[in-house]
């Protein structure tokens, strides 16, 4: 017997929640960023990240599984052809949630959820910048001591 999911239920019924998440994910993949309520953004993040992970493999079976959840073929092609190659080197964390001001009409907490497509900074580059910063700090400390 399936047990009910705990937590926020968007729209009342489970089928309505699935449709809401499907439409939000489609809009996120189409536009790159969307404004929505905090509750919807928090539920959309793992949903969208699982779809992006499936798109990274690029197999026909994964494309069909994503097509079951997102019925728009253009958005599926954007996901597999544009978004997945940009995040191929990432192992997760494809989305970012930024808190915004509350909505004017009903004071609902709003957020912007967006795709993270920037390149990851390599550990060697960050190590080099830290080394340069520490060397500069040592030079400043030495000049102040004199």
UniProtKB/Swiss-Prot annotation:
Gene3D superfamilies: Ribosomal protein L17. It holds the Pfam family Ribosomal_L17. GO terms for cellular component: cytosolic large ribosomal subunit. InterPro entries: Ribosomal_bL17, Ribosomal_bL17_CS, Ribosomal_bL17_sf. Coiled coil: none annotated. SUPFAM superfamilies: Prokaryotic ribosomal protein L17. Residues 124-146 are annotated as: Disordered. Keywords: Ribonucleoprotein, Ribosomal protein. Signal peptide: none annotated. GO terms for molecular function: structural constituent of ribosome. Residues 124-134 have a biased composition (Low complexity). GO terms for biological process: translation. It comes from the Bacteria. Part of the 50S ribosomal subunit. Contacts protein L32. Belongs to the bacterial ribosomal protein bL17 family. PANTHER family: LARGE RIBOSOMAL SUBUNIT PROTEIN BL17M, RIBOSOMAL PROTEIN L17. This is Large ribosomal subunit protein bL17. It comes from Corynebacterium kroppenstedtii (strain DSM 44385 / JCM 11950 / CIP 105744 / CCUG 35717).
